[in-house]
Amino acid sequence: MTQWIAGEWVEGLGEEFTSLSPYDNQVVWRGKGATAEQVEMAVKAARQAFVGWKTLSVAEREAVVLAFAEQVKENSEEIAQVIAKETGKPLWETRTEAAAMAGKIAISIRAYHERTGESQKEAAGNQIVLRHRPLGVMAVFGPYNFPGHLPNGHIVPALLAGNTVVFKPSEQTPWTGELAMKLWQAAGLPQGVINLVQGGKETGIALAESKGIDGLLFTGSANTGHLLHRQFAGQPGKMLALEMGGNNPMVITDHYGDLDATVYTIIQSAFISAGQRCTCARRLYIPLGEKGDALITRLVEATKKLRVDQPFAEPAPFMGPQISVAAANFILAAQANLQSLGGESLIEAKAGEAAFVTPGIIDVTNIAELPDEEYFGPLLQVVRYQTLEQAVELANDTRFGLSAGLVSTDDGEWQYFVDHIRAGIVNRNRQLTGASGDAPFGGPGASGNLRPSAYYAADYCAYPMASMEGEETSLPATLSPGVEL
């Protein structure tokens, strides 16, 4: 039973698909996808549940969400184990994701009250009241890299606002999506408030094209996000929130401070989660000269020693495999393409068993036209530069704008960087992959729109209703010109 529709677990009627553990290619989940007809059943179930859910008090909706948070905490180890088996991420990392699933709920609740909710004031004898109302049925598309944590950043704010949800997990991580829904069920969520539809491309197309949804909240690749953007053109009545990828630059200056701390910050930025975070550093700008040379030498040495292994290995690995063999092949093909354009590998990424790829670092300074692509894996491109102004200009030469970072102890360099860089997340002397759940998450350009995450998601899950109210009608002291009573 792979679909959860109107509170009932039912078998998919579409094509069979499986989830393979990327570190050994073993089947960890098997089921059938939802057909277009089943997707419509899920949308209708969400619509039928909408009125009852939105008319509950905020406190009542919040109580269900908090019950889900307790389920997540009580089952955190099972969540971590499932995510590790399905994504190949190290167990220490998936445990942090399970904890973040619960932590983000508290942020979402606070955000609802601070950014939406209700408020009123008196002005000129009138009560000015601001209320917020849910949009309706929200389609939520989840990614594979954080299959438990990231969908929560859409689903929980949507539910708190009074929306109902049809959730489609990534076809790479159906097991995690199924487990999350079972925890919602155990939390006492009313039937139809969330509906789960599993499947691949056809299931996703059917959900995105459904006339019954009022919005679509998406985290995933830029290519898919741009297709959705074109599909939703001319439909201003539907909310579309996109969080996509980035070709993220990290600039190191001669004032980088401690050598080992800088190397560690680069490794955490480029290779954590095997490079499968949308905020990972893809382009590394290093100054020409002795200090830059020393940094590269140390970075190469440290990268060669990174432990790459299956998630339950002892001692624990730093990173695991790519999500699939196809994803691994994509990284190797990208490396080969950069080499053909004139790039020189400082460490060559190599294929291992199943979907494993070792980290690669390639000097692309001599490539005249560097492809502006997101290589979603452990492939770091190095560019040598002469001046900070040149580095920032090169860093901004991208259609994306998700994250960027500067490593420098010089306050003047930081001020120049933050004044001229174009990105939504800009860090100094910290890894690019570091972000706060209280802060906006996202960036301009091809990286998306709005700011999907726990706190700012409240903004796109409800619309403001402004009212000017009085206890009764009243006549002004002077009637408008041309009016007689």
Swiss-Prot record:
One family name in Pfam for this protein: Aldedh
Enzyme kind, highest EC tier: oxidoreductase
Keyword NAD: yes
Gene Ontology molecular function: any one: succinylglutamate-semialdehyde dehydrogenase activity
Active site: E243, C278
Catalysed reactions, as listed in the record: N-succinyl-L-glutamate 5-semialdehyde + NAD(+) + H2O = N-succinyl-L-glutamate + NADH + 2 H(+)
Recorded superkingdom: Bacteria
Residue positions binding NAD(+): G220, S221, A222, N223, T224, G225
Keywords, in A-Z order: Arginine metabolism, NAD, Oxidoreductase
InterPro entries assigned: Ald_DH/histidinol_DH, Ald_DH_C, Ald_DH_CS_CYS, Ald_DH_CS_GLU, Ald_DH_N, Aldehyde_DH_dom, SuccinylGlu_semiald_DH_AstD
Gene Ontology BP, a term: arginine catabolic process to glutamate
Pathway membership, UniProt: Amino-acid degradation; L-arginine degradation via AST pathway; L-glutamate and succinate from L-arginine: step 4/5
Record-annotated disulphide pairs: none
Its EC number(s): 1.2.1.71
Function: Catalyzes the NAD-dependent reduction of succinylglutamate semialdehyde into succinylglutamate.
Family from the record: Belongs to the aldehyde dehydrogenase family. AstD subfamily.
Protein name: N-succinylglutamate 5-semialdehyde dehydrogenase
Record organism: Vibrio vulnificus (strain CMCP6)
Record lineage: Bacteria, Pseudomonadati, Pseudomonadota, Gammaproteobacteria, Vibrionales
